[in-house]
Regions:
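Glycine-rich phosphate-binding loops of nucleotide-dependent enzymes
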Residues: 1-133
Length: 133
């Protein structure tokens, strides 16, 4: 007898997400669901609103309308730190690195709760993360 598949938990839900800039509607009532373990690609022409959508999800700026939920909890990110605390981050096409920092320091900069760097711990964390992936 086959065991029924357990429904995947929704990690991210977007409902009616809209973002407008002067003279432009970048995103118009976007609905999107992402379940645990899924991988999606957002495709579109230049200026289609892909980066705008991802920037709202990552907390870089708020939506003008709509609702976003992370694991069922309604969220209104006002900055990237809030998104990171919910395990949402964004890797930019063009890396924004701090030139005077080491690789380890650049990697750890976006981590929640980091006030002072213990480089020995940072190097260990990076080793552990790189072994997982």
């Amino acid at each position: 007898m086959e065991t029924p598949l357990k429904p995947l938990q929704l990690s991210l839900e977007l409902r009616g997400i809209t973002k407008k800039f002067p003279g432009i509607v970048a995103n118009d009532s976007v609905d999107f669901d992402l379940s645990e373990g899924e991988i999606h690609t957002i495709l579109g022409e230049n200026g289609a609103g892909k980066s705008t959508l991802m920037s709202m999800i990552a907390g870089l700026f708020p939506a003008d309308e709509g609702e976003m939920r992370v694991f069922g909890e309604k969220v209104n990110f006002t900055n990237p730190r809030q998104a990171i605390e919910k395990s949402i981050g964004m890797v930019f096409q063009h890396f924004m690195l701090v030139k005077n920092h080491t690789v380890a320091e650049n990697i750890i900069l976006g981590q929640p709760g980091v006030v002072r760097l213990n480089l020995k711990e940072v190097h260990q964390q990076i080793r552990e993360i790189s072994e997982r992936y």
